[in-house]
């Protein structure tokens, strides 16, 4: 598993599995989402551990981007996980261009949700970037 796209997709699947069953063993989850006899890529661990450890910060940054009256609990689980993953890459993976992180999140939404969700994810992440002062 060499492509970042495939690793990102595996990270989404692992995060979804862990959100569904927080008691699950991460190594067992990685074994489920990776092809058989595949070593766990370092970037997969970085994404999963990063999103989990920064989840409160990510959620706090996402909440103001939602429309009035909306909360994170109202989002579907796939959409929330995709938003967290995309925002994690935007905020913490400096080598990842913001536009690429958004594009990857949109692709995940198209695959694991629907076109409406893809537009929603695009809007939320783009709004976050616009609202964030550039260094």
Swiss-Prot record:
Keyword Transcription regulation recorded: yes
InterPro entries: NusB-like_sf, NusB_fam, NusB_RsmB_TIM44
Assigned keywords, A-Z: RNA-binding, Transcription, Transcription antitermination, Transcription regulation
Tagged with keyword RNA-binding: yes
One Gene Ontology biological process: DNA-templated transcription termination
Gene3D superfamilies noted in UniProt: NusB-like
MF term (GO), any: RNA binding
GO annotation, cellular component aspect: cytosol
Described function: Involved in transcription antitermination. Required for transcription of ribosomal RNA (rRNA) genes. Binds specifically to the boxA antiterminator sequence of the ribosomal RNA (rrn) operons.
Record family assignment: Belongs to the NusB family.
Matching PANTHER family: ANTITERMINATION NUSB DOMAIN-CONTAINING PROTEIN (PTHR11078:SF3), N UTILIZATION SUBSTANCE PROTEIN B-RELATED (PTHR11078)
Family annotation (HAMAP family): NusB
Protein name from the UniProt record: Transcription antitermination protein NusB
Species whose genome carries this gene: Lacticaseibacillus casei (strain BL23)
Classification lineage: Bacteria, Bacillati, Bacillota, Bacilli, Lactobacillales
Name of the encoding gene: nusB
């Amino acid at each position: 598993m060499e492509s970042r796209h495939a690793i990102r997709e595996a990270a989404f699947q692992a995060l979804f599995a862990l959100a569904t069953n927080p008691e699950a063993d991460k190594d067992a989850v990685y074994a489920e989402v990776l092809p058989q006899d595949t070593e766990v890529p370092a970037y997969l661990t970085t994404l999963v551990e990063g999103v989990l450890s920064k989840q409160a910060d990510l959620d706090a940054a996402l909440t103001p981007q939602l429309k009035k009256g909306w909360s994170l609990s109202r989002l579907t689980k796939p959409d929330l996980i995709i938003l967290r993953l995309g925002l994690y890459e935007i905020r913490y993976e400096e080598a990842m261009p913001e536009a690429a992180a958004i594009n990857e999140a949109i692709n995940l939404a198209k695959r694991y949700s629907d076109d409406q969700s893809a537009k929603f994810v695009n809007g939320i992440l783009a709004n976050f970037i616009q609202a964030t002062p550039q260094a």
